Protein backbone atom coordinates (compact mmCIF):
# COMPACT_ATOMS: atom_id res chain seq x y z
CA UNK A 1 0.00 0.00 0.00
CA UNK A 2 2.83 2.43 0.78
CA UNK A 3 4.05 1.93 -2.80
CA UNK A 4 0.69 3.14 -4.12
CA UNK A 5 0.68 6.07 -1.69
CA UNK A 6 4.08 7.45 -2.65
CA UNK A 7 3.80 11.18 -3.19
CA UNK A 8 5.17 10.95 -6.73
CA UNK A 9 2.55 8.35 -7.67
CA UNK A 10 -0.25 10.45 -6.19
CA UNK A 11 1.06 13.53 -8.05
CA UNK A 12 1.09 11.53 -11.28
CA UNK A 13 -2.51 10.41 -10.75
CA UNK A 14 -3.93 13.80 -9.77
CA UNK A 15 -2.18 15.63 -12.58
CA UNK A 16 -4.00 13.52 -15.13
CA UNK A 17 -6.82 15.23 -17.01
CA UNK A 18 -9.48 13.51 -14.90
CA UNK A 19 -8.51 15.54 -11.84
CA UNK A 20 -8.01 19.01 -13.27
CA UNK A 21 -11.41 20.26 -12.04
CA UNK A 22 -10.95 19.29 -8.42
CA UNK A 23 -11.52 16.01 -6.70
CA UNK A 24 -12.43 14.51 -3.35
CA UNK A 25 -10.63 11.85 -1.37
CA UNK A 26 -12.82 9.45 0.60
CA UNK A 27 -11.52 6.35 2.31
CA UNK A 28 -11.46 3.86 5.11
CA UNK A 29 -7.71 3.51 5.30
CA UNK A 30 -5.57 1.07 7.26
CA UNK A 31 -5.01 2.85 10.55
CA UNK A 32 -1.25 2.36 10.48
CA UNK A 33 -1.14 4.56 7.36
CA UNK A 34 -3.07 7.51 8.84
CA UNK A 35 -0.15 9.80 9.70
CA UNK A 36 1.67 8.91 6.48
CA UNK A 37 -1.42 9.75 4.41
CA UNK A 38 -2.03 12.97 6.36
CA UNK A 39 1.55 14.08 5.62
CA UNK A 40 0.97 13.39 1.91
CA UNK A 41 -2.28 15.35 2.00
CA UNK A 42 -0.54 18.26 3.73
CA UNK A 43 2.15 18.24 1.03
CA UNK A 44 -0.55 18.39 -1.64
CA UNK A 45 -1.99 21.60 -0.19
CA UNK A 46 0.79 23.74 -1.61
CA UNK A 47 0.24 22.21 -5.05
CA UNK A 48 -2.10 23.66 -7.64
CA UNK A 49 -4.20 20.52 -8.06
CA UNK A 50 -5.26 19.69 -4.51
CA UNK A 51 -8.38 17.90 -3.26
CA UNK A 52 -11.49 19.97 -2.50
CA UNK A 53 -12.49 17.66 0.33
CA UNK A 54 -11.05 14.74 2.28
CA UNK A 55 -13.23 12.34 4.29
CA UNK A 56 -11.48 9.50 6.10
CA UNK A 57 -12.33 6.87 8.67
CA UNK A 58 -9.52 6.79 11.20
CA UNK A 59 -8.94 5.50 14.70
CA UNK A 60 -11.06 7.55 17.15
CA UNK A 61 -8.05 8.57 19.26
CA UNK A 62 -6.25 9.90 16.18
CA UNK A 63 -9.34 11.85 15.10
CA UNK A 64 -9.55 13.41 18.56
CA UNK A 65 -5.88 14.42 18.33
CA UNK A 66 -6.47 15.98 14.90
CA UNK A 67 -9.34 18.21 16.09
CA UNK A 68 -7.82 18.94 19.52
CA UNK A 69 -7.99 22.44 20.99
CA UNK A 70 -6.03 24.03 23.86
CA UNK A 71 -5.04 22.77 26.39
CA UNK A 72 -4.75 19.49 24.45
CA UNK A 73 -3.09 20.74 21.28
CA UNK A 74 -0.36 18.60 19.75
CA UNK A 75 1.87 18.66 16.71
CA UNK A 76 -0.61 16.68 14.60
CA UNK A 77 -3.46 19.04 15.52
CA UNK A 78 -1.54 22.24 14.77
CA UNK A 79 -0.24 21.00 11.42
CA UNK A 80 -3.53 19.46 10.30
CA UNK A 81 -5.46 22.58 11.32
CA UNK A 82 -2.87 24.72 9.51
CA UNK A 83 -3.84 23.01 6.25
CA UNK A 84 -7.46 21.95 6.84
CA UNK A 85 -10.65 22.87 8.60
CA UNK A 86 -10.96 19.63 10.57
CA UNK A 87 -14.10 18.09 12.01
CA UNK A 88 -15.22 14.74 13.40
CA UNK A 89 -18.42 13.87 11.54
CA UNK A 90 -19.31 10.69 13.39
CA UNK A 91 -17.96 8.17 15.87
CA UNK A 92 -18.20 4.56 14.67
CA UNK A 93 -18.24 2.07 17.54
CA UNK A 94 -16.20 -1.11 17.21
CA UNK A 95 -19.40 -3.15 17.71
CA UNK A 96 -20.65 -1.90 14.32
CA UNK A 97 -18.13 -4.17 12.60
CA UNK A 98 -17.97 -7.93 12.30
CA UNK A 99 -15.59 -9.13 13.49
CA UNK A 100 -15.24 -6.14 15.82
CA UNK A 101 -11.85 -4.39 15.83
CA UNK A 102 -10.11 -3.51 19.10
CA UNK A 103 -10.73 0.24 18.78
CA UNK A 104 -13.53 2.67 17.95
CA UNK A 105 -13.28 4.68 14.74
CA UNK A 106 -14.25 8.18 13.67
CA UNK A 107 -15.10 9.73 10.33
CA UNK A 108 -13.23 12.99 9.86
CA UNK A 109 -13.85 15.71 7.33
CA UNK A 110 -10.94 17.85 6.14
CA UNK A 111 -11.61 20.93 4.03
CA UNK A 112 -8.45 22.55 2.62
CA UNK A 113 -7.74 26.07 3.85
CA UNK A 114 -6.11 28.90 1.98
CA UNK A 115 -3.57 30.97 3.83
CA UNK A 116 -0.60 33.10 2.90
CA UNK A 117 1.91 30.61 4.26
CA UNK A 118 0.78 27.54 2.31
CA UNK A 119 1.24 29.38 -0.99
CA UNK A 120 4.79 30.38 -0.03
CA UNK A 121 6.98 27.25 0.36
CA UNK A 122 9.70 29.07 2.34
CA UNK A 123 7.23 30.46 4.89
CA UNK A 124 5.38 27.15 5.04
CA UNK A 125 8.63 25.33 5.82
CA UNK A 126 9.63 27.87 8.48
CA UNK A 127 6.21 27.63 10.16
CA UNK A 128 6.45 23.83 10.28
CA UNK A 129 9.97 24.07 11.75
CA UNK A 130 8.70 26.45 14.44
CA UNK A 131 5.83 24.17 15.45
CA UNK A 132 8.04 21.06 15.42
CA UNK A 133 10.55 22.82 17.66
CA UNK A 134 7.73 23.95 19.94
CA UNK A 135 6.49 20.39 20.37
CA UNK A 136 9.94 18.75 20.38
CA UNK A 137 9.47 18.02 24.09
CA UNK A 138 5.76 18.56 24.80
CA UNK A 139 6.12 18.34 28.60
CA UNK A 140 8.64 21.17 28.63
CA UNK A 141 7.73 24.82 28.41
CA UNK A 142 7.39 26.59 25.11
CA UNK A 143 10.27 28.83 26.13
CA UNK A 144 12.63 25.89 26.66
CA UNK A 145 11.62 24.24 23.39
CA UNK A 146 11.84 27.35 21.21
CA UNK A 147 15.10 28.68 22.62
CA UNK A 148 16.89 26.18 20.38
CA UNK A 149 15.82 28.21 17.33
CA UNK A 150 14.93 31.67 18.71
CA UNK A 151 16.87 33.72 21.28
CA UNK A 152 15.44 33.20 24.77
CA UNK A 153 15.13 36.93 25.44
CA UNK A 154 13.05 37.42 22.30
CA UNK A 155 10.65 34.63 23.36
CA UNK A 156 10.37 35.99 26.91
CA UNK A 157 9.62 39.47 25.60
CA UNK A 158 6.92 38.11 23.28
CA UNK A 159 5.28 36.02 26.01
CA UNK A 160 5.20 38.90 28.49
CA UNK A 161 3.94 41.37 25.87
CA UNK A 162 1.07 39.00 25.03
CA UNK A 163 0.17 38.21 28.66
CA UNK A 164 1.31 34.59 28.36
CA UNK A 165 3.05 32.89 31.25
CA UNK A 166 6.73 32.07 30.81
CA UNK A 167 5.82 28.53 31.87
CA UNK A 168 3.20 28.00 29.15
CA UNK A 169 3.39 24.64 27.39
CA UNK A 170 2.94 24.15 23.64
CA UNK A 171 -0.35 22.25 24.15
CA UNK A 172 -1.95 25.41 25.58
CA UNK A 173 -1.60 27.35 22.31
CA UNK A 174 -4.16 27.45 19.51
CA UNK A 175 -3.30 27.53 15.82
CA UNK A 176 -3.90 31.30 15.88
CA UNK A 177 -1.41 31.61 18.76
CA UNK A 178 1.17 29.68 16.73
CA UNK A 179 0.57 31.91 13.71
CA UNK A 180 1.04 35.04 15.85
CA UNK A 181 4.26 33.64 17.32
CA UNK A 182 5.45 32.90 13.80
CA UNK A 183 4.64 36.40 12.57
CA UNK A 184 6.32 38.15 15.48
CA UNK A 185 9.27 35.89 16.28
CA UNK A 186 10.21 34.35 12.94
CA UNK A 187 9.08 36.80 10.28
CA UNK A 188 10.23 39.94 12.14
Which sequence ranges carry the predicted segments?
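Catalytic cores of RNA-modifying enzymes
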Residues: 1-132
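A structural signal for short hydrophobic/aromatic patches embedded in well-ordered alpha helices
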Residues: 66, 158-159, 181
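Residue-level marker of structural boundaries
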Residues: 71-72, 151, 164, 187
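An accessory alpha-helical subdomain
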Residues: 96, 106, 110-112, 118-155, ...
Amino acid sequence: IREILKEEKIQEIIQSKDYNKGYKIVGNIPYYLTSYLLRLLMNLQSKQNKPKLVVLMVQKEVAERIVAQPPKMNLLAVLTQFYFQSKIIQIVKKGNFSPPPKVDSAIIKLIPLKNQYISNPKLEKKFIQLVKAGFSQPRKTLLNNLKTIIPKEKIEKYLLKNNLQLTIRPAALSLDDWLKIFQELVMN
